[in-house]
Amino acid sequence: MSSQSPKRMYGTGNNFVIIDSRSINNLNWNYREIANQNGCDQIIVITNSSAADCFMHIYNADGGEVEMCGNAARCVGYLIMSEKSTEYATIELVNKRILECFKVGGRSIKVNMGKPLFKWHEIPLSAKCDPLHLPIELEMLKDPVAVNIGNPHMVFFVDNISEIPLQSLGPKLEKHTLFPKKVNVNIAQVEKSGEISLRVWERGTGITASCGSAACAALIASVLRGYLITRQTSVNLPGGKLLIEWPDNIFMTGDIGFL
């Protein structure tokens, strides 16, 4: 992987521009302009790390840096593993988490996303309340679950995700006063098969075809609410399918590719 040679990649419907800046550790890029020119969900900048194989900076289309992106981690993990000719790589994030990436076959990459956080101040919320039943209601959406997967999420459960006007409700919910750092908004439907169908309004980006941490949040919320007994299922997003497992840490597996 050559330094500063941008690559366009995707992870289950999420599109990224990935810049390797390890040779000079340069973060001075116009992220909004890059996003507008390339039509990507996020810009990923790889720099050096003393604690892992690399440090991954994640910038949304609005130019703001965020803490976590599981789908981007799978793409970066693949690049690092290809560079090292190994099947394992580690990635440091701005929130100090170290993600472990594993090659499980072809371009299918598994990521250990770490332990989810559930306490109200860990998510974080601006006021003490029960994260399993947030006092939030907007039109047909109510009673969401909040969880932190390295970034804040709230999950609403509905009978039919296609009926939810996410384009109009997403911006309002993202900026809800209960979330001082804003929040990723997830609309989940637990299917009879035990799989989860999911739509996502991503903080700082908007409606997105996929979001790995959102898929993790959806499984966790489904288990905590008692909608699922198993801690492993497939989450179906507009951009494709992710396998999510929650034995203790949360794991996500899916395909990556180049654009």
Curated annotation (Swiss-Prot):
Substrate binds at residues 14, 42, 60, 70-71, 151, 184, 202-203, 212-213. Its EC number is 5.1.1.7. Keywords: Amino-acid biosynthesis, Cytoplasm, Isomerase, Lysine biosynthesis. InterPro entries: DAP_epimerase_AS, DAP_epimerase_DapF. The active site is at 69 (proton donor), 211 (proton acceptor). Pathway: Amino-acid biosynthesis; L-lysine biosynthesis via DAP pathway; DL-2,6-diaminopimelate from LL-2,6-diaminopimelate: step 1/1. Gene3D superfamilies: Diaminopimelate Epimerase, Chain A, domain 1 (3.10.310.10). SUPFAM superfamilies: Diaminopimelate epimerase-like. The keyword Cytoplasm applies. It catalyses: (2S,6S)-2,6-diaminopimelate = meso-2,6-diaminopimelate. It comes from the Bacteria. Belongs to the diaminopimelate epimerase family. Homodimer. This is Diaminopimelate epimerase.
